Each structure stands twice: as C-alpha cells, then as structure tokens.
C-alpha cells in the first residue's frame, strides 16, 4: 500500500539518521586539510552528483518493482557491469576481449528475456527499462564514490550522499505520488516512524543501508567499482528465490530463465576480465 518513491525515501531517511552520528564523530576528529578539501566546490559538486545518482537509482528501481516482475527488475538493475563497458566504448577506452564477449552475451540475454513482455502479464518493457535506468544511475554513484573515497572519511561521504537522495525522493513522492506530512502513515512522508512500519525500515537502514551501501562505499577506497559488481551475480537468483518463498514473486517463465542465465554469464565475463586486467597492472 506504500508507493514506491515514498518507500525508498523512508529507507534513506532512516539510513541517514543511522549515518549522522558517525559523520559527526569523523568531522570532529578530522584534520583541517581534509576538511578544507571536502568543502572545495569541485568535491561538493561530486557529492551532490552522487546523491542525485543514488536518488535516481532508488527511484527508478523502486518504480520498476511494481511495474515488472521481481526477477526482471533484479536482472536489469544489477546489469551495471554492462553499463561500465558501454561507458568505456563511449569514451574510447579499449575493451578486453572477454569484456566484448560479455557485453554481447549480456545484450543477447536481455533481448531474449524481453520476449517475456508478450508472454508474462507481470513483465513490462517500461518496468524493465526503469530497472536498467537504475543500473545506469548506480554506475554514477559508484564512480563518484571511487573518486572521493580514496581520501575522504567513509561516513562524511556516505551521510550527505544518502541525505541528498532521501530529500529528493521525499519531494518527488510528494509531487508524483500525492504523499504529504499529515497523511495517513502509508502515505505520509515520515510514516516509517509509525510502529507498523518501523521494524521493517529499521532493518533496511541497518542491514542493506549501513552494512550494504555504506559497506560498498567503504571498500571503494581500495577496490574499483566494477570488481564490486561481482556480488550482483547472486542477487537475481537469491532475490527471486526469496520472493517465491514469501509469495511476492512467481516462478520465472522460460524466456526469463534462458535470457537471465545468458545475462549473468555475460556479467561474469565482464567482471572477470576487469579483475584479470587489475592483476596484470599490479604485476607490471
């Protein structure tokens, strides 16, 4: 009964509250040089851009969850390794052979999975496109994190980015979904504070929020974004399995199974090629 943008805003509002005290502690302990660096216009713009990307990711993915099947939503939103490859082609970066094969497999798999649009009443083209837009947005979020996390304290990066995304989602929900401050809890901008919703949102803030997204930001200091993407290979399988168990998803049709398997093989090739490239660079 909770609209998708509102649901996403609740999660990020709660996550922001969890991150805030850690950010205050790091700000007070930080030396003046790093503090002045954070306040440089260029770095503030990167933080803002990262927050906008996180907002777009949660907004488009959340919308896709109610406009296509759970399996399709997870398959397309976790396809961001393919987005890295497309971006590399656009900027003229040479591709490794396995990356090229992986990208080709990914697009073939996507085309096959989209046949389900005509065969499965749950699947829609717009829903799948929205999920893929979420993958594009998360690439910007990861790239911005890689740029700043090499020197910027974890929570001083994660808090403002999450807060910006939460604010944008809250106002977007007001304008697009008709939610507001004084509405019933399922339509209220801060309805997650109601005891009916608090346990679930607290879990999302502490689990996927603090441990998940903030954990990713933590390792971006040492690991390139595309390597982190290896963890996504299990998400469509695990997410669909859980959805079937709790009754929120149907078993995928044949084209989704075939196309999804090919997409995941393509993602594996892209990621393993990048990891191999990193090993070569390190040895040199």
Stretches with model-predicted labels:
Residues 13-17, 107, 166-167, 237-238, ...:
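Small-residue-rich packing faces within the transmembrane alpha-helices of Major Facilitator Superfamily
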Residues 8, 12, 116, 197-199, ...:
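C-terminal-most transmembrane helix of multi-pass membrane proteins
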Residues 1, 33-34, 114-124, 176-195, ...:
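Membrane-interface helix termini and inter-helical loops of multi-pass transporters
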Residues 18, 80-104, 237-257:
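C-terminal transmembrane-helix exit sites in multi-pass transporters
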Residues 4-5, 16-19, 84-85, 90, ...:
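Transmembrane alpha-helical segments that form core, pore/gating elements
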Residues 19, 23, 95-117, 135, ...:
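Hydrophobic transmembrane alpha-helices of multi-pass small-molecule transport proteins
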Residues 7, 11, 64, 90-95, ...:
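Hydrophobic/aromatic residues within transmembrane alpha-helices
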Residues 22, 48-67, 112, 129-144, ...:
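Hydrophobic alpha-helical transmembrane segments of multi-pass membrane transport proteins
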């Amino acid at each position: 009964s909770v609209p998708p943008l509102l649901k996403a805003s609740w999660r990020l509002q709660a996550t922001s509250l969890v991150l805030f005290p850690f950010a205050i502690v790091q700000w007070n302990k930080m030396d003046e040089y790093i503090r002045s660096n954070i306040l440089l216009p260029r770095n503030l713009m990167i933080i803002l851009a990262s927050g906008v990307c996180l907002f777009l990711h949660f907004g488009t993915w959340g919308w896709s969850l109610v406009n296509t099947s759970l399996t399709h939503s997870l398959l397309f939103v976790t396809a961001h390794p393919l987005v890295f490859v497309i971006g590399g082609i656009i900027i003229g970066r040479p591709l490794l052979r396995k990356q090229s094969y992986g990208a080709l497999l990914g697009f073939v798999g996507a085309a096959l999975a989209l046949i389900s649009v005509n065969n499965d009443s749950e699947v829609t083209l717009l829903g799948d496109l929205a999920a893929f837009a979420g993958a594009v947005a998360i690439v910007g979020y990861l790239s911005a994190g890689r740029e700043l996390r090499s020197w910027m304290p974890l929570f001083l990066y994660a808090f403002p980015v999450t807060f910006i995304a939460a604010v944008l989602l809250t106002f977007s929900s007001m304008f697009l979904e008709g939610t507001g401050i004084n509405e019933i809890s399922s339509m209220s901008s801060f309805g997650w504070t109601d005891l009916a919703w608090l346990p679930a949102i607290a879990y999302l803030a502490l689990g996927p929020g603090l441990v998940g997204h903030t954990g990713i930001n933590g390792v971006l200091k040492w690991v390139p974004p595309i390597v982190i993407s290896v963890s996504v290979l299990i998400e469509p399988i695990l997410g669909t399995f859980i959805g079937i168990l709790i009754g929120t998803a149907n078993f995928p049709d044949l084209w989704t199974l075939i196309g999804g398997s090919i997409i995941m093989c393509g993602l594996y090739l892209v990621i393993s090629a990048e990891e191999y490239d990193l090993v070569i660079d390190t040895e040199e």
